[in-house]
């Protein structure tokens, strides 16, 4: 291509002409030879990873399409979010918690958290199952909560997490952290009947809210869902709960749990207890934790009645 004569042009005009000249050179480049193959695009394998087990139950193509549509509808535009009834039915949330949970779930932040969970659940095996993420709402109403035990995130091994912090269903081996918790209960109440299982549903029915600061986890990857945003939701729920129900004992176990609730200087209606996480890896042995007795001493003093820490019906 012939050289261009740019004499007499302004600097701006020279830039424009120069750009056009470069573009013309691109167009003039010879095409690929007929026998020269086009470079192949790299594509990732279609579908979920090998061995993936869906937490959604129905894995048919039509179910996937409906699932993706429901994710997209969670955040429709800047401010449109799903109504309470749809969210409550989708996650099996008890109606008793509507007043506390509706403002946190039926808003932009809440819809973003749920949408991020749903997005991950397409390609990850997530615990607990979707219908158990809010299982903690199904055992006692907010006004009946006497104690809140806050942990980190659910167990990441198959068959363990079922929506109650630290708890496992009957028949499942008791995890090390829960063993330490039960040892601490025994130290406070030697006569407590703890049976031979790790299911803490009996505590939940007696007003103990067993809540993780992060409500979901990827299989085999503890801490993997910290960026979903559950912590914002949990902090706000505990703040609302503390403002509507008097005389609650907050047991915050571990550094992460201790960021979920901050007692204000003027709020002496509640008791806040802090201790290291019950994991065997913690520096401080959890078996010496006296929170269970301290909780009952406080509840008895304010007339709310002690908690039976046994695991019998």
Swiss-Prot record:
GO terms for biological process: base-excision repair, AP site formation via deaminated base removal. One of its GO terms (molecular function) is uracil DNA N-glycosylase activity. It is found in: Host nucleus. Residues 56-68 have a biased composition (Polar residues). One of its GO terms (cellular component) is host cell nucleus. SMART domains: UDG (SM00986), UreE_C (SM00987). It comes from the Viruses. It catalyses: Hydrolyzes single-stranded DNA or mismatched double-stranded DNA and polynucleotides, releasing free uracil. Keywords: DNA damage, DNA repair, Host nucleus, Hydrolase. Its EC number is 3.2.2.27. Excises uracil residues from the DNA which can arise as a result of misincorporation of dUMP residues by DNA polymerase or deamination of cytosines. Therefore may reduce deleterious uracil incorporation into the viral genome, particularly in terminally differentiated cells which lack DNA repair enzymes. This is Uracil-DNA glycosylase. The gene is MDV014.
């Amino acid at each position: 291509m012939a050289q261009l004569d740019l004499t007499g042009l302004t600097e701006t005009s020279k830039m424009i002409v120069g750009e056009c000249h470069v573009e013309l050179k691109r167009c003039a480049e010879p095409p690929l030879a007929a026998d020269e193959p086009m470079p192949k695009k790299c594509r990732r394998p279609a579908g979920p990873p090998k061995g993936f087990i869906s937490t959604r139950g129905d894995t048919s193509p039509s179910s996937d399409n409906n699932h993706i549509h429901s994710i997209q509808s969670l955040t429709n535009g800047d401010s449109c979010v799903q109504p309470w009834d749809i969210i409550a039915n989708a996650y099996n949330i008890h109606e008793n918690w509507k007043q506390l949970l509706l403002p946190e779930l039926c808003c932009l932040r809440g819809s973003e958290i749920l949408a991020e969970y749903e997005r991950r659940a397409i390609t990850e095996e997530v615990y607990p199952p979707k219908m158990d993420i809010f299982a903690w709402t199904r055992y006692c109403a907010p006004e009946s909560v006497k104690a809140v035990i806050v942990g980190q995130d659910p167990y990441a091994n198959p068959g363990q997490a079922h929506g109650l912090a630290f708890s496992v269903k009957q028949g499942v081996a008791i995890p090390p952290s829960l063993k330490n918790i039960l040892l601490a209960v025994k130290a406070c109440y030697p006569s407590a009947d703890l049976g031979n299982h790790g299911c803490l549903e009996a505590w939940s029915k007696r007003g103990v809210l067993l809540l993780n600061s992060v409500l979901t986890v990827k299989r085999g990857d503890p801490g993997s869902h910290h960026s979903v945003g559950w912590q914002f939701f949990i902090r706000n729920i505990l703040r609302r709960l503390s403002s509507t129900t008097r005389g609650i004992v907050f047991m915050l176990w571990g550094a992460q749990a201790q960021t979920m609730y901050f007692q204000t200087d003027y709020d002496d209606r509640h008791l806040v207890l802090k201790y290291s996480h019950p994991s065997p890896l913690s520096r401080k042995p959890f078996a010496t934790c006296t929170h269970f007795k301290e909780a009952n001493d406080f509840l008895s003093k304010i007339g709310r009645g002690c908690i039976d820490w046994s695991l019998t019906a």
